[in-house]
Protein backbone atom coordinates (compact mmCIF):
# COMPACT_ATOMS: atom_id res chain seq x y z
CA UNK A 1 0.00 0.00 0.00
CA UNK A 2 1.36 3.42 -0.92
CA UNK A 3 1.90 6.10 1.72
CA UNK A 4 -1.10 8.23 0.73
CA UNK A 5 -3.37 5.19 0.60
CA UNK A 6 -2.34 4.09 4.07
CA UNK A 7 -2.78 7.60 5.43
CA UNK A 8 -6.27 7.80 3.94
CA UNK A 9 -7.20 4.48 5.48
CA UNK A 10 -5.83 5.52 8.86
CA UNK A 11 -8.01 8.61 8.78
CA UNK A 12 -11.01 6.31 8.38
CA UNK A 13 -10.20 4.69 11.70
CA UNK A 14 -11.24 5.91 15.14
CA UNK A 15 -9.04 6.12 18.21
CA UNK A 16 -10.81 3.68 20.55
CA UNK A 17 -10.16 0.61 22.64
CA UNK A 18 -8.65 -2.18 20.60
CA UNK A 19 -11.78 -4.22 21.04
CA UNK A 20 -11.00 -6.76 18.35
CA UNK A 21 -8.33 -8.38 20.46
CA UNK A 22 -6.13 -5.85 22.22
CA UNK A 23 -8.59 -5.25 25.05
CA UNK A 24 -7.20 -8.19 27.00
CA UNK A 25 -3.81 -9.84 27.07
CA UNK A 26 -2.12 -13.17 26.77
CA UNK A 27 0.37 -12.04 29.39
CA UNK A 28 3.41 -9.87 29.77
CA UNK A 29 6.51 -10.91 27.92
CA UNK A 30 9.81 -10.77 29.74
CA UNK A 31 13.02 -9.68 28.04
CA UNK A 32 14.00 -13.33 28.28
CA UNK A 33 10.70 -14.61 26.90
CA UNK A 34 8.88 -15.60 30.13
CA UNK A 35 5.30 -14.66 30.91
CA UNK A 36 3.19 -13.47 33.79
CA UNK A 37 -0.57 -13.13 34.05
CA UNK A 38 -3.08 -10.32 34.61
CA UNK A 39 -1.61 -7.35 32.71
CA UNK A 40 -3.65 -4.14 32.41
CA UNK A 41 -5.91 -3.41 29.46
CA UNK A 42 -4.49 -1.71 26.39
CA UNK A 43 -4.60 2.03 25.92
CA UNK A 44 -6.65 3.41 23.02
CA UNK A 45 -5.16 2.78 19.61
CA UNK A 46 -6.10 2.97 15.94
CA UNK A 47 -9.35 1.06 15.59
CA UNK A 48 -11.47 0.23 12.58
CA UNK A 49 -14.87 1.89 12.22
CA UNK A 50 -15.83 -0.45 9.40
CA UNK A 51 -14.07 -2.92 7.18
CA UNK A 52 -12.58 -1.16 4.16
CA UNK A 53 -12.49 -2.81 0.78
CA UNK A 54 -9.77 -5.36 0.20
CA UNK A 55 -6.52 -3.95 -1.10
CA UNK A 56 -6.02 -4.34 -4.83
CA UNK A 57 -2.29 -4.80 -4.23
CA UNK A 58 -1.19 -8.25 -5.32
CA UNK A 59 1.39 -9.96 -3.18
CA UNK A 60 4.65 -10.20 -5.05
CA UNK A 61 6.16 -13.70 -5.08
CA UNK A 62 9.65 -13.86 -3.64
CA UNK A 63 11.82 -16.08 -5.78
CA UNK A 64 15.38 -17.26 -5.44
CA UNK A 65 17.75 -20.16 -5.80
CA UNK A 66 18.71 -20.43 -2.15
CA UNK A 67 18.16 -23.44 0.13
CA UNK A 68 14.63 -24.23 1.36
CA UNK A 69 13.57 -22.31 4.44
CA UNK A 70 13.46 -24.14 7.74
CA UNK A 71 9.99 -24.78 9.15
CA UNK A 72 9.24 -22.43 12.07
CA UNK A 73 8.63 -23.80 15.54
CA UNK A 74 4.90 -24.00 16.25
CA UNK A 75 3.75 -22.00 19.25
CA UNK A 76 0.75 -22.05 21.54
CA UNK A 77 -2.24 -20.39 19.88
CA UNK A 78 -3.07 -17.25 21.83
CA UNK A 79 -6.52 -15.72 22.10
CA UNK A 80 -5.24 -12.23 22.95
CA UNK A 81 -1.98 -10.38 22.22
CA UNK A 82 0.73 -9.42 24.67
CA UNK A 83 0.28 -5.83 25.86
CA UNK A 84 3.29 -5.24 28.06
CA UNK A 85 6.65 -6.55 29.17
CA UNK A 86 7.40 -7.97 32.58
CA UNK A 87 10.40 -8.03 34.81
CA UNK A 88 11.74 -6.06 37.71
CA UNK A 89 12.62 -2.41 37.59
CA UNK A 90 11.66 0.49 35.36
CA UNK A 91 11.65 -1.24 31.98
CA UNK A 92 9.72 -0.11 28.91
CA UNK A 93 9.70 -1.08 25.25
CA UNK A 94 9.48 1.17 22.19
CA UNK A 95 7.79 -0.09 19.02
CA UNK A 96 7.44 1.47 15.57
CA UNK A 97 4.95 0.31 12.93
CA UNK A 98 4.44 0.41 9.15
CA UNK A 99 8.01 0.91 7.94
CA UNK A 100 10.71 1.02 6.98
CA UNK A 101 10.47 4.39 5.27
CA UNK A 102 13.54 6.05 3.70
CA UNK A 103 12.43 9.53 4.78
CA UNK A 104 11.69 8.93 8.47
CA UNK A 105 13.15 5.61 9.63
CA UNK A 106 16.82 6.70 9.32
CA UNK A 107 16.20 9.67 11.63
CA UNK A 108 14.56 7.43 14.22
CA UNK A 109 17.43 4.96 14.00
CA UNK A 110 19.90 7.82 14.38
CA UNK A 111 18.17 9.01 17.57
CA UNK A 112 18.06 5.51 19.02
CA UNK A 113 21.75 5.06 18.21
CA UNK A 114 22.62 8.39 19.82
CA UNK A 115 21.23 7.15 23.14
CA UNK A 116 22.27 3.49 22.65
CA UNK A 117 18.65 2.31 22.78
CA UNK A 118 17.12 -0.74 21.08
CA UNK A 119 13.55 -0.86 19.81
CA UNK A 120 11.10 -3.12 17.97
CA UNK A 121 10.05 -2.36 14.40
CA UNK A 122 6.93 -4.03 13.00
CA UNK A 123 7.57 -4.03 9.27
CA UNK A 124 5.31 -4.20 6.22
CA UNK A 125 6.59 -6.54 3.53
CA UNK A 126 6.14 -4.13 0.63
CA UNK A 127 8.28 -1.60 2.49
CA UNK A 128 10.89 -4.21 3.38
CA UNK A 129 11.61 -5.15 -0.24
CA UNK A 130 11.96 -1.47 -1.16
CA UNK A 131 14.26 -0.61 1.76
CA UNK A 132 16.40 -3.67 2.43
CA UNK A 133 19.35 -1.58 3.58
CA UNK A 134 17.30 -0.14 6.44
CA UNK A 135 16.26 -3.60 7.59
CA UNK A 136 19.89 -4.70 7.47
CA UNK A 137 20.80 -1.66 9.54
CA UNK A 138 18.19 -2.64 12.14
CA UNK A 139 19.83 -6.04 12.42
CA UNK A 140 23.32 -4.56 12.69
CA UNK A 141 22.28 -2.13 15.43
CA UNK A 142 20.52 -4.75 17.55
CA UNK A 143 16.88 -3.87 16.97
CA UNK A 144 14.21 -6.57 16.87
CA UNK A 145 11.79 -6.68 13.96
CA UNK A 146 8.29 -8.09 13.73
CA UNK A 147 5.76 -8.94 11.04
CA UNK A 148 3.10 -6.29 10.27
CA UNK A 149 1.74 -7.95 7.08
CA UNK A 150 2.56 -7.10 3.48
CA UNK A 151 0.05 -4.36 2.60
CA UNK A 152 -1.34 -3.36 6.04
CA UNK A 153 -4.90 -4.63 5.46
CA UNK A 154 -7.69 -5.02 7.99
CA UNK A 155 -7.24 -8.72 8.71
CA UNK A 156 -10.79 -9.20 9.95
CA UNK A 157 -12.00 -8.41 6.42
CA UNK A 158 -9.80 -11.03 4.73
CA UNK A 159 -10.16 -14.71 4.05
CA UNK A 160 -7.86 -17.07 5.90
CA UNK A 161 -5.68 -17.77 2.84
CA UNK A 162 -5.30 -14.02 2.26
CA UNK A 163 -4.15 -13.52 5.84
CA UNK A 164 -1.67 -16.37 5.42
CA UNK A 165 -0.26 -14.84 2.24
CA UNK A 166 0.12 -11.42 3.89
CA UNK A 167 1.98 -12.88 6.85
CA UNK A 168 4.07 -15.53 5.10
CA UNK A 169 5.32 -13.23 2.34
CA UNK A 170 6.35 -10.64 4.92
CA UNK A 171 8.25 -13.18 7.02
CA UNK A 172 10.09 -14.32 3.88
CA UNK A 173 11.03 -10.75 2.97
CA UNK A 174 12.22 -10.00 6.50
CA UNK A 175 14.37 -13.12 6.59
CA UNK A 176 16.00 -12.15 3.30
CA UNK A 177 17.02 -8.70 4.62
CA UNK A 178 17.27 -9.15 8.39
CA UNK A 179 18.83 -12.61 8.40
CA UNK A 180 16.22 -14.22 10.65
CA UNK A 181 12.51 -14.87 10.46
CA UNK A 182 10.43 -12.64 12.74
CA UNK A 183 9.19 -14.13 15.99
CA UNK A 184 6.66 -11.39 16.71
CA UNK A 185 3.55 -10.28 14.87
CA UNK A 186 1.30 -7.23 15.16
CA UNK A 187 -2.07 -7.01 13.42
CA UNK A 188 -2.67 -3.77 11.50
CA UNK A 189 -4.98 -1.42 13.42
CA UNK A 190 -4.82 -3.81 16.38
CA UNK A 191 -7.61 -5.81 14.71
CA UNK A 192 -7.03 -9.46 15.61
CA UNK A 193 -9.09 -12.55 14.86
CA UNK A 194 -8.75 -16.26 15.46
CA UNK A 195 -7.18 -16.91 12.07
CA UNK A 196 -4.45 -14.33 12.74
CA UNK A 197 -3.59 -15.94 16.08
CA UNK A 198 -3.60 -19.45 14.59
CA UNK A 199 -1.53 -18.56 11.55
CA UNK A 200 0.92 -16.51 13.56
CA UNK A 201 1.50 -19.41 15.95
CA UNK A 202 1.95 -21.82 13.03
CA UNK A 203 4.62 -19.48 11.62
CA UNK A 204 6.43 -19.27 14.95
CA UNK A 205 5.29 -15.76 15.88
CA UNK A 206 3.86 -14.41 19.13
CA UNK A 207 1.24 -11.61 18.97
CA UNK A 208 2.28 -8.21 20.33
CA UNK A 209 -0.02 -5.23 20.88
CA UNK A 210 0.78 -2.13 22.97
CA UNK A 211 0.01 -0.33 26.20
CA UNK A 212 0.38 3.33 25.22
CA UNK A 213 -0.55 4.74 21.81
CA UNK A 214 1.28 7.97 20.96
CA UNK A 215 -1.51 8.79 18.46
CA UNK A 216 1.20 10.00 16.09
CA UNK A 217 -0.81 8.50 13.23
CA UNK A 218 -3.28 11.38 13.70
CA UNK A 219 -0.45 13.98 13.48
CA UNK A 220 -1.66 15.66 16.70
CA UNK A 221 1.45 17.82 17.14
CA UNK A 222 4.85 17.16 18.67
CA UNK A 223 3.86 18.34 22.15
CA UNK A 224 0.88 15.97 22.23
CA UNK A 225 3.02 13.00 21.23
CA UNK A 226 5.61 13.89 23.86
CA UNK A 227 2.92 14.23 26.53
CA UNK A 228 1.34 10.89 25.60
CA UNK A 229 4.65 9.09 26.09
CA UNK A 230 5.78 10.90 29.22
CA UNK A 231 2.39 10.72 30.97
CA UNK A 232 1.96 7.06 30.02
CA UNK A 233 5.43 5.97 31.10
CA UNK A 234 5.36 3.17 33.68
CA UNK A 235 7.15 -0.13 34.29
CA UNK A 236 6.20 -2.69 31.65
CA UNK A 237 4.69 -0.25 29.16
CA UNK A 238 4.92 -0.93 25.41
CA UNK A 239 4.80 2.32 23.40
CA UNK A 240 3.25 2.41 19.92
CA UNK A 241 4.68 4.86 17.36
CA UNK A 242 4.95 4.86 13.56
CA UNK A 243 7.88 5.44 11.22
CA UNK A 244 5.84 5.20 8.00
CA UNK A 245 2.28 5.27 6.66
CA UNK A 246 2.05 9.05 6.37
CA UNK A 247 3.83 12.21 7.46
CA UNK A 248 5.94 11.08 10.42
CA UNK A 249 7.99 14.25 10.84
CA UNK A 250 6.23 14.87 14.16
CA UNK A 251 7.26 11.43 15.36
CA UNK A 252 10.86 12.13 14.41
CA UNK A 253 10.90 15.42 16.32
CA UNK A 254 8.99 14.06 19.30
CA UNK A 255 11.31 11.12 19.98
CA UNK A 256 14.22 13.55 20.25
CA UNK A 257 12.38 15.09 23.21
CA UNK A 258 10.78 12.21 25.04
CA UNK A 259 13.56 9.62 24.68
CA UNK A 260 16.19 11.49 26.74
CA UNK A 261 13.45 12.38 29.25
CA UNK A 262 12.61 8.70 29.79
CA UNK A 263 16.27 7.82 30.22
CA UNK A 264 16.82 10.69 32.65
CA UNK A 265 13.79 9.43 34.59
CA UNK A 266 15.52 6.10 35.12
CA UNK A 267 13.74 3.96 32.55
CA UNK A 268 15.56 1.11 30.82
CA UNK A 269 14.35 0.60 27.26
CA UNK A 270 14.54 -3.03 26.24
CA UNK A 271 13.40 -5.47 23.57
CA UNK A 272 12.46 -9.16 23.56
CA UNK A 273 15.17 -11.61 22.54
CA UNK A 274 15.79 -11.98 18.81
CA UNK A 275 15.40 -15.71 19.35
CA UNK A 276 12.72 -16.93 21.76
Task: Please provide the spans of the model-predicted regions.
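An N-terminal domain-start capping segment
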Residues: 12-13, 149, 181-183
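Catalytic domains of cell-wall/extracellular-matrix polysaccharide-remodeling enzymes
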Residues: 107, 129, 153-268, 272-276
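N-terminal pre-catalytic segment of deacetylase/amide-hydrolase enzymes
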Residues: 1-94, 101-114, 257-260, 264-276
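Alpha-helical structural elements
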Residues: 52, 77, 117, 143-145, ...
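Active-site beta->alpha N-cap acidic-glycine motif
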Residues: 57-158, 162, 166, 171-173
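A general, composition-driven signal for non-globular sequence regions
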Residues: 3-5, 142, 180, 236
